[in-house]
Amino acid sequence: ECVELVDDLYKFRDCYFETHSLDDATRKTSDVAQQMEQTLKKMEEQEQSLKHKAEFLLQKGRCLNVAQDFSAVAEECLSRAVKLEPGLVDGWNALGEQYWKKGDMIGARNCFTGALQQKKNKVSLRNLSMVLRQLPAPDSDSAGKQVLESVDLASQAVAMDEQDGTSWYILGNAYLSLFFTSGQNQQFSTKAFSAYAQSEKVDKVASSSPELHFNRANLFQYEEMFSSALAGYSRAAALDPSWAELTAKEKQLLEYLEKVTELAENKGKVKARRLRTMLSNLSSSALGPCSSPQFRSPSGRVGSLEPVTLSSLKHGHNAGVAALGKVVFSLASEGRMAFTFGMVDSEETCMVVTVYNTANSWGVLIGDSVVIPEPLLKRHSITHKDKTFDFKSIRVDSPLLLIVNGKKQNIHSQIVTSISYRPQHE
């Protein structure tokens, strides 16, 4: 009966929004805590009649483990339970989650590994996947191996039960990490999106996980899918109003889009006379190495590039050509994922440019001449709540691809972006 009581408690927590509206989100933590206290009371009434001490300790530990934060009492109950009965896989898993909550990743790893030695199970596999991504690695090679192993463990968890949304979600996070440790290989962001979608599809509980919406929104923002990012941050904030970072992310992204569109429309607010002077010394000599027949483009094409106007660029990748203009504004926004600037060409067309993987010290100044070899043009049409944004931009994946004032950029101008995502606090 104790097992049923605790299972019901977890069901209450995980299916909270099936019986409550989003307006109750602020009460969820206290409602779960109240339910936990009631469950403990009922369990303690039955304690005397229980013959198996280890089983009672396990269920009491599981009950306390329902809360987001570390519980010393839970740790003690679970430690005693697995000492009495080392074969209790659920005990090892719950104890590992307690170590995770107090930040002891080595202790957590040992528990999940120990549980797997008793019996292969999806909970240990996916939890170990999470732990491996949080463990510090001595060097980038080891870090890469840890992330690959993390993907493998989460995949094994999914294979054991394809209807478990939590395993799919953790696989999504593993692919998200792999995307950033593998030089931002597009196939891994696609796999992350696909795992997140599967998590929602197979499991109603997963779709009310604020972490899923937040982590996916981070990836949407990096991929410049701004409408989806805003919707994700907004949904996550509604599901967990106590998590301040969420409302901040949504607000930051909206402010960024407002600023960018306003600056692009006003050509960086540069006065007409100054703009004419700036553009008068914009010549094809600014092309620098791009004008050489030996120039190797990012796509691998060898040969000089033809300078073209911004208005003549087509949607997507523009092979064999280079966009050329003067910087009229730059923006290194708070919580930024990209260095953003605006450039104006000889026709006085203004274009937003987003540059990724930039070192904090790197930037361009108003008046600089910038050449973008084989530009990637994107069109944004964004609607969120009562706001709409419509603009075009050029995405550049590294400052090393740009020619500024006729020169290639120094290797130190690039630092590979990593994304901060919130691991599930299970």
Regions found by a protein language model. Name each.
Residues 45-48, 80-83, 113-117, 152-159, ...:
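Conserved structural position within tetratricopeptide repeats
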Residues 53, 88, 121-122, 164, ...:
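Residue-level recognition of tetratricopeptide repeat
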Residues 56, 91, 124-125, 167, ...:
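TPR alpha-solenoid repeat register
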Residues 68-69, 103, 136, 145, ...:
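Residue-level detector of the short coil/turn that links helix A to helix B
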Residues 318, 328-357:
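OB-fold (S1/OB) nucleic-acid-binding surfaces
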Residues 357-373:
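Short nucleic-acid-contacting surface segments enriched for D/E, G, S/T with interspersed K/R
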